[in-house]
Design a protein with these regions (language model features):
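A short SAM/SAH-binding and catalytic strip from SAM-dependent methyltransferases
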Residues: 101-117
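Class I SAM-dependent methyltransferase SAM/SAH-binding core
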Residues: 49-93
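C-terminal lobe and adjacent flexible extensions of AdoMet/dcAdoMet transferase-like proteins
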Residues: 203-243
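A short glycine-rich, Lys/Arg-flanked "PGG" loop and its adjoining helix->strand segment in the class I
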Residues: 120-132
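A short acidic, Gly/Pro-enriched loop at the edge of an enzyme's catalytic core
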Residues: 93-102
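Conserved class I S-adenosyl-L-methionine
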Residues: 1-47
Length: 243
């Protein structure tokens, strides 16, 4: 039986175009405001190092875990000085040593963990890495926008220098709390198509999962600058503290 390719292996070539580092300076400042002298950070689903590399340059010790070898290779190509330590592996089963200040799960990665048990395992893994009082940070899209959505959502977005187009068609299942996105990148004489599946949770659901794994919600904002959450927010940054 052929094994399905990993999501990260499929998108690694385009990942930095899909998620340009426009907010990275705010992420760096977010961490600096909590750890002025630098922090030990573990990044679950580190990808190409979009935020991990700038955090390391800013004086933090950053360790990244990703199941996709191609993602890790892309990170290493961008980080020849090896400022970010890396490992290829499934972070849902990772075991830490309790010495880290912060665990970051960025860019909707937590919602791409589809099973309840796998999410619980991920939070337990984060707990094992963190010191008492350490912080778990989840960056997710704002789920409430999709609760009443039943029609497909389509969009066209220029990428990079404008020579590529991203075509998105998102099917929403509000009962299963699931988004299925068919994404195509068109241009340069080529078409690349891939699928993203995510299962969203409301903030209160995340907080219940967190409490069961030993985390208490500390704050939630709509962005890395700390602006308050409201109905118009498109994303949430949720910070939890390890008991």
């Amino acid at each position: 039986m052929n094994k399905a390719p990993l999501y990260g292996d499929v998108v690694s070539e385009f990942y930095d175009l899909l998620y340009p580092p426009t907010d990275v300076s705010h992420v760096v400042e977010y961490v600096r405001s909590r750890y002025p002298s630098g922090a030990r950070i573990v990044d679950f689903g580190v990808g190409t190092g979009r935020t991990a590399i700038p955090l390391a340059i800013a004086g933090n010790h950053v360790h990244g875990i990703d199941i996709s070898e191609r993602m890790i290779e892309a990170l290493r190509d961008k980080d020849p000085e090896r400022g970010v330590t890396t490992e290829v592996g499934d972070f849902t089963h990772a075991v830490g040593d309790g010495t880290y200040d912060m665990c970051m799960i960025m860019n909707n990665t937590f919602f791409m963990i589809l099973g309840h048990e796998e999410r619980t395992q991920t939070l337990r893994a984060a707990y094992s890495f963190l010191k008492p009082g350490g912080r778990l940070v989840l960056e997710t899209y704002a789920a409430h926008h999709y609760l009443r959505e039943s029609s497909p959502i389509t969009s066209i977005t220029p990428l990079g220098a404008g020579d590529l187009l991203l075509l998105d068609k998102i099917d929403v299942d509000p009962i299963k709390q699931q988004l299925l996105a068919l994404r195509s990148i068109v241009g340069r004489g080529n078409v690349a198509t891939f699928v993203e599946i995510s299962r969203f949770s409301l903030p209160q659901e995340l907080d219940v999962l967190g409490r069961a794994a030993g985390f208490d919600i500390a704050e939630r904002s709509r962005n890395w600058q700390g602006d308050p959450v409201d109905a118009a927010a498109l994303s949430h940054v949720s910070e939890y503290v390890r008991r």
